[in-house]
Amino acid sequence: MPEANKVYVFIDESGDPVYYGNRKKLLVDTDGFQPYLFIGMIETSDRKALRKAVVDFIESIREDSLYNSIPSTTTNKGWYVHARGDHPEIRAKFFELLRNLDGYKAHIVIAKKDLNIFNRKHNNNPTEFYFDVLHHLLNGRLLNVDCQYNLYLSQRGNNSLHRFQQAVDKALEANEIKTHGKIKYNLEIIASKEMPELSIIDYLMWAVQRKLLKGESRYFDALKDKYETVLNLYEEDIK
């Protein structure tokens, strides 16, 4: 059963907030440049069920002779479910799992990189850009003063607990005005391989990214009812 009055939030990203490389070389329109930053989250009150579903999936792959000879599952003892690196057959099976998995809702924010916005709003600072997008993701989401929110941010790049705290505090300022109460929360930054629940939002973001960058919508369409919001900050909604 879900834990009373506890909500778990798992946050991940795809792409990066970087515009410049070594010696301040502008990377826009060069090979390897990531044109978008995606940050997404899932909310659940039944963390144990989600975790069990992912862990059971990993164990079933390792025990199945049809899949356990795939190199990524045999050469990497720390293998975990990760959309970009997973074998297509494993990826398809995990999407099937997600189609039938309940007990969570997803939110995604898409930020197309715009150099003018980066210069004007984010002071040429990729960290400011990242946490501004994170603020948009969290804004208006954590509203129940009777809940204890537990937020887990996937450990990537220059993520820091201090900046995470700032982004959450900024998002909660407006929320607390609306709710006339103090929102209770805990924060933690953790590696994806140590938190199986993060694989769920990783796959949900991969589906959005695939639709946007490759024009392949079948993954997104298969999970469409799992997305509560998909916010495209600078362009039209993709839904």
Model regions: which residues?
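Phosphate-ester processing/binding pockets and catalytic centers
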Residues: 1-239
